């Protein structure tokens, strides 16, 4: 009986410690920190038809002393700016597909008293990479002279600390084209889409326009860190939306997307060496 009690007590302690680690206490966290880390990195992504959300995930000086600033969003938010047309190739003697990418507009909000949106600052961005199957896209801001003032922190790699089910999460986006606002819920489960790509299920409500925003957790590092990109909501019947059953593209898929498209430096990877051209000796 004593052995059973001891094992049971150890199990309780381990479980309790895990829950505390998953949801660290936020004592000492100020509203200013919550605004700067969750709200302010959000942008509105505007196209000629429709809009969605985006998140600034990188803004640093490059070797030419110009600012490289990148915004993460969903592919379906910017898909109308990707044009595929067929043209005749006299060289191949057949029709071939060509792709063109139109620039998109992004709006950053300005605030009074931390929370009151008073207007936006516009920027133009180019579509640098996209992945239909993962529903992710990366935009680069054309403005090279000014650094983006607020950048989201990505959830670190290689840490055995979640995200876990029951962890408190925050969804932030520009729903319906309005100034960004947060909703809170739990990480409820894991799933996959029809292509087998992993998804997070959360009870943080999202609505139309939240796509391309982000899902946050408060980490043991006492910062709010991005763990996913809200992508879709559950529905039943004829378009009956269940906003508190929200699906997000997880941070693991985001890392794969960035690395496959040679943007691993955003994750802190060392720059890949350029391939040397081999001269033809003949």
For the regions a language model picked out, list residue spans one by one.
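Positively charged n-region of N-terminal signal peptides that target proteins for export
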Residues: 1-7
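Catalytic nucleophile loop of clan PA
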Residues: 55, 205-230
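C-terminal cap/linker of serine protease catalytic domains
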Residues: 22-33, 82-113, 226-282
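Short, solvent-exposed loop/turn segments that connect beta-strands within catalytic domains
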Residues: 60-68, 116-118, 194-196, 218-225, ...
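A conserved glycine-rich beta-strand in the N-terminal activation segment of trypsin-fold
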Residues: 30-31, 42-74, 241, 245
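Flexible, gly/ser-rich surface segments that form the specificity/activation loops bordering the active-site cleft
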Residues: 126-130, 149-199, 206-212, 232-242
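Active-site substrate-binding loop(s) of clan PA
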Residues: 33-34, 52-55, 60-62, 82, ...
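Bacterial N-terminal signal peptides
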Residues: 7-16
């Amino acid at each position: 009986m004593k052995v059973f009690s001891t094992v049971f007590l150890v199990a309780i302690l381990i479980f309790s410690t895990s829950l505390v680690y998953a949801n660290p206490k936020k004592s000492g966290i100020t509203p200013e920190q919550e605004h700067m880390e969750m709200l302010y990195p959000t942008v509105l992504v505007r196209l000629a038809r429709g809009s969605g959300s985006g998140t600034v995930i990188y803004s640093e000086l490059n070797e030419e002393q110009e600012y490289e600033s990148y915004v993460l969003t969903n592919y379906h938010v910017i898909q109308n700016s990707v044009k595929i047309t067929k043209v005749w190739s006299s060289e191949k003697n057949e029709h071939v597909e060509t792709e063109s990418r139109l620039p998109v507009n992004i709006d950053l909000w300005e605030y009074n008293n931390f929370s009151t949106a008073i207007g936006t600052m516009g920027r133009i961005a180019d579509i640098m990479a996209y992945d239909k199957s993962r529903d992710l896209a990366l935009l680069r801001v054309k403005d090279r002279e000014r650094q983006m003032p607020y950048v989201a922190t990505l959830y670190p790699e290689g840490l055995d600390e979640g995200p876990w089910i029951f962890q408190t999460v925050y969804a932030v986006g520009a729903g319906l084209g309005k100034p960004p606002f947060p909703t809170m819920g739990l990480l409820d489960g894991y799933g996959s889409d029809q292509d087998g790509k992993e998804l997070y299920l959360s009870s943080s409500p999202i609505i139309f326009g939240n796509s391309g925003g982000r899902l946050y957790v408060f980490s043991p590092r006492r910062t709010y860190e991005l763990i996913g990109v809200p992508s879709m909501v559950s529905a039943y019947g004829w378009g009956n939306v269940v906003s508190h059953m929200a699906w997000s593209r997880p941070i693991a898929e985001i890392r794969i997307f960035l690395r496959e498209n040679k943007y691993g430096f955003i994750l802190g990877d060392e720059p890949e060496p350029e391939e040397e051209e081999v001269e033809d000796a003949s």
